[in-house]
Regions:
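Hydrophobic membrane-targeting alpha-helices
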Residues: 45, 101, 124, 128, ...
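N-terminal TM1-TM2 helical hairpin plus the immediately adjacent luminal interfacial "cap"
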Residues: 16-138, 185-195
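Charged, low-complexity, helix/coiled-coil-prone segments
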Residues: 85, 90, 146-150, 254
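C-terminal transmembrane module of polytopic alpha-helical membrane proteins
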Residues: 1-31, 41, 165, 170-265
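Cytoplasmic-side transmembrane-helix entry/capping segments in multi-pass membrane proteins
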Residues: 112-117, 138-142, 163-171
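Alpha-helical transmembrane bundle and helix-membrane interface signal
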Residues: 104-109, 149-169, 215-226
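Specific transmembrane alpha-helix
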Residues: 121-124, 133-156, 201-213
Length: 265
């Protein structure tokens, strides 16, 4: 197990805040969020201008399909596709506003892992609870980043300036979008397609639990070590359960929230 080194003496609140602010770095640049956003725009342009038919998007080798779960890359690559420009713009806006600050402090590797695991958690969770749907969209990764902000505050609360405002801002964005997703799921459809709130929830759960494990902790205490183990155990148990579930219940098993056609998330 890799141990994270910590300072021998605890920081005072003023020093801790300065220390955390000093962690923001543009060198190396936060390339993961930028590269991911550019890739998503390029994929949207390709499927909009080159192959504009929605049937082509549904037949894309990148989309998550329950009948193609043996093609494991689909659990990740569906996050590069979007059903419309509003869907794309919202996801990119949130992941840039939320992801870049995290990447500047914690580095591209940690944030890249969090984002991709959020995407995977979105499709794995959907495969269990909404087992008969197709998926496009990066909201699993976006919600992993939102929840990672909560993990970041829990880890470094005493070292931050205005941590409560950070939580309020993240909670506002998450609850607003999540409320729309749940409403849309039961009452309407965006772009003629239903929104999968399961992928939002499972992406957020992955971001919170894994974020508490891999994000940098500048204020380590005994209770943080206990929280670290609880988070690691929860994350591992959820991932193992969904993988085993998929192995034991191949398509066309119908999950708790049955649906059809394509969902955006």
């Amino acid at each position: 197990m890799i141990k994270i080194s910590i300072d021998e003496f605890p920081l005072t609140e003023e020093k801790g805040q300065k220390n955390y602010l000093d962690r923001y770095r543009c060198c190396p640049p936060p390339l993961f969020i930028i590269f991911t956003s550019i890739l998503q725009v390029m994929m949207f342009v390709y499927y909009t201008l080159v192959v504009p038919s929605s049937e082509d998007l549904l037949s894309s080798p990148l989309i998550y399909r329950p009948d193609k779960r043996s093609e494991l890359w689909r659990f990740v690559t569906y996050g590069t596709l979007h059903a419309g420009w509003i869907h794309l713009a919202f996801n990119i806006l949130v992941q840039v506003l939320v992801g870049l600050p995290l990447e500047m402090v914690h580095g591209s590797l940690r944030i890249g892992i969090l984002y991709l695991v959020g995407i995977i958690a979105g499709s794995l969770g959907t495969s269990v609870f909404d087992a008969d749907v197709y998926l496009v969209g990066a909201s699993g990764g976006v919600y992993a980043l939102l929840a990672a902000h909560l993990a970041n505050v829990l880890n470094n609360y005493s070292n931050m300036q205005f941590p409560s405002l950070r939580l309020l801002a993240v909670a506002f964005v998450a609850t607003t979008d999540m409320g729309f997703a749940v409403y849309d799921y039961f009452n309407g459809m965006m772009f003629g397609l239903p929104v999968s709130y399961i992928a939002h929830l499972t992406g957020a759960l992955a971001g919170l639990t894994l974020g508490l494990v891999i994000l940098k902790n500048f204020n380590q205490k005994i209770q943080h070590h206990l929280l670290w183990w609880i988070s690691l155990g929860t994350f591992t148990a959820c991932i193992v359960f969904t993988i085993i579930f998929n192995i034991l219940h191949p398509f066309p098993y119908l999950g708790i929230g049955q649906a059809s056609n394509m969902f955006v998330q």
